[in-house]
């Protein structure tokens, strides 16, 4: 039996969650351990592959072959500075096969194996698919998968590929804060008044801010911003560094960082202490025989934790200012500020946001861990033709987070689609040659907000050749950008005189484009 609808999957940096709409209600599905969220962890041993809780539970014994944080690698290049700095915190080995794409190498069943970030993510997606199948008692073929709103084209495409590898037809990629807004909007009900809602989504690895208006079932995103590399993991890292130094001080300079197992046990204790500090003002860490048989005990206060992560917490406010600016909205016009993501439980984060909005009461009505999967599942139901009184008339109008354009003479970034444009969208512009009798043009596609392409992100390039000889500026070359509802880009170019055309879909292999 095949389930004829689609499931909604929140593929998170640290935890993932799956939901399904059936019988007029939405269910967030518990996994085989009874947990409604599943760690985004995959482990390889001499005999098997483990995914989820089973993988995370054995991480201290098997740190080199337990992979997590694939979302911090997906769609990025190996020599990206972010990847290079993350590698310092990871016990597993990340290398590249010379094409600047990162691969993770592990020992599996006694031999060395390498996996791409998409393959690791596909294993987590597979686990979520199986969790849903066990619950539904049917095979699942389709899913809506969420990504951070600030994910770029490569990261979106790579996430879609991960779904395909997991045997899922990804009906749509949707933005996490927008999915959370659906959960919020459905939960709140409709009073017929337009509301301006700001979603503040701080998770395990990523941060998004989205400003939207909700009016009679229409969810219209006005602006989005964020940091694809900020979240709970970064706060854990600060604690790990702090306690590593503390251990050195108490034990004649012994450095526990030389042991991956010790570091992992410390990290697990730090994650626990961080959670404790959201409800208590101090937390104690106790680990027996942490390193060279030395027991470790230490206490940290909430105030100290806030000091260690102060710059990170404060950095969440700038994207909030940016979305208001982009949407040309005054902060006093925001009706609801909705918190999403586990890291929004941190009291300091809450007080910073509340203070920014003049002491406003924040909205905590939706479950910060489940809202994204909830919204994704509602969208999955609608996109597969589901009809319900509760969801009828629901329409999502999302935007593209980054400006898209091409390079023109002198390395100038010429924008075709500006950031925060509603998607799907299609824009064309006429360009010409800059030399007499120029036989072809080399079209380079970029995304980013800077004036020069060298400061933007190259998505890909292609050539349009066979232009008949003509003086410079005479040939008419129409370049068209077509951005679909997933936020994935197709670019085509046509020489008007001859009707010659060429096009590309920006694929996950950056710079190596699939010619249609």
Swiss-Prot record:
CDD domains: ASKHA_NBD_HSP70_HSPA1. GO terms for molecular function: ATP binding; ATP-dependent protein folding chaperone. It comes from the Eukaryota. InterPro entries: ATPase_NBD, Heat_shock_70_CS, HSP70_peptide-bd_sf, Hsp_70_fam. It holds the Pfam family HSP70. Keywords: ATP-binding, Nucleotide-binding, Stress response. Transmembrane segments: none annotated. Belongs to the heat shock protein 70 family. This is Heat shock 70 kDa protein. The gene is HSP70.
